[in-house]
Amino acid sequence: VRLFTAIYPPADAVAHLTAQVTGLRLAAASAAGTNVRLVDPTKAHLTLAFLGDVEAARLTEVRQALGAAVDDARGGAVLGAGLAGPPVLRLGGGGRFGWGRSTVLWVDVRGEVTRLGALAGAVRVALATAGLPSDERPFRPHLTIARPGDRLPHADIEADLATLDAYLGPPWPAEELVLVQSQPGPPSRYHHVTAWPL
């Protein structure tokens, strides 16, 4: 099974972001028929660790490792001693990964990002300690909004990045860590396997 761990923003934060994305040039291009591969708002998430393909027989090990990481977080060992509750985040700003055919536009994460990074680190360490696969890339919290590739003029991408730079969504608590199984598409499908409250 193909797995990743994620934090899902609440519906009001996603709706706020969706209203912003609707005003971008890439949304106008999509409405005109250009395949800019807008991300379905119901799938909007922040990936903490990508495990990739894991044997179904190891799913129990994955759950145990993630449960231990969340227990550490709840106990203050990860999210900061004396800081009760989940990290409070907000979506704001934005950027791009890649160029040309591999261009991806994303929204940045603001707020208690250090605590979110500590949780991502704990998740990755717990997976590695259990001998499970996990990201080796540095954690860069973001929410992908589109994969336009080279189907939009450079000027439109730059204009959308400038618009995103001024964006700041409402604050929200990252209330749970979710283990997600992805099934490649089109369209790709996500199935929530297990969730742990933070």
Give the ranges of each region predicted by the language model.
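Histidine-dependent nucleotide/RNA phosphoesterase domain, centered on the 2H-phosphoesterase fold
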Residues: V1-L198
